[in-house]
């Protein structure tokens, strides 16, 4: 017989962690799982700063906790990404932000590898996450929409101004 005893307090803490991360996964607009092994302390600090500025939460969590949390959140397909060291980036606001920051950072830091992710509740592959990263941010998309909506009004204003100037010069 083994003298190993199960520590009830440790099990309770892990169950609580699973609940916390399952809730984060359920509420998140997007999640990106990455392997940040091999980043220097300076690179890791820079990455965390950029993610924080973008409103993204970045955590390194045990794979067993993440796997159970993903199952509890109904994201079973994400469990395959939890092998080797895993860091998870959560965003509740901007769907593109975690993918964009991590993909941009990975261009300079070869040791950062995106594994998979979740976009609005759908498990996505590494390739899909990188495609999302190439999209403009929410603010960028809104500014593009605004300029498209303003164009007809601007054209009408210019046409009215041209007619007014033509009539003034004719008079």
From Swiss-Prot:
Gene3D superfamilies cross-referenced by the UniProt entry: 3.30.70.1730
GO CC terms: large ribosomal subunit
Family annotation (Pfam families): Ribosomal_L10
A single BP term in Gene Ontology: translation
Alphabetically ordered keywords of this record: Ribonucleoprotein, Ribosomal protein, RNA-binding, rRNA-binding
One Gene Ontology term of the molecular function aspect: structural constituent of ribosome
Family: Belongs to the universal ribosomal protein uL10 family.
Role played: Forms part of the ribosomal stalk, playing a central role in the interaction of the ribosome with GTP-bound translation factors.
Subunit structure: Part of the ribosomal stalk of the 50S ribosomal subunit. The N-terminus interacts with L11 and the large rRNA to form the base of the stalk. The C-terminus forms an elongated spine to which L12 dimers bind in a sequential fashion forming a multimeric L10(L12)X complex.
Name by which UniProt lists this protein: Large ribosomal subunit protein uL10
Organism: Lactococcus lactis subsp. lactis (strain IL1403)
Classification of source organism: Bacteria, Bacillati, Bacillota, Bacilli, Lactobacillales
């Amino acid at each position: 017989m083994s003298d190993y005893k199960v520590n009830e307090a440790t099990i309770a803490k892990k169950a609580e962690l699973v609940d916390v991360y399952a809730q984060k996964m359920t509420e998140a607009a997007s999640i990106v799982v990455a392997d940040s092994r091999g980043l220097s302390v300076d690179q890791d600090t820079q990455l965390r700063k950029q993610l924080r500025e973008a409103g993204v939460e970045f955590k390194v969590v045990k794979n067993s906790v993440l796997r159970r949390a993903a199952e509890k959140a109904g994201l079973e397909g994400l469990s395959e990404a939890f092998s080797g060291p895993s860091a998870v980036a959560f965003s509740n606001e901007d769907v593109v932000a975690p993918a964009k920051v991590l993909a941009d950072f990975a261009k300079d830091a070869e040791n950062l590898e995106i594994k998979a992710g979740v976009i609005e509740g759908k498990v996505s592959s590494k390739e899909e996450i990188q495609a999302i990263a190439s999209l403009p941010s929410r603010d960028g998309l809104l500014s593009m929409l605004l300029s498209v909506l303003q164009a007809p009004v601007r054209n009408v204003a210019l046409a009215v101004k041209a007619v007014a100037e033509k009539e003034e010069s004719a008079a």
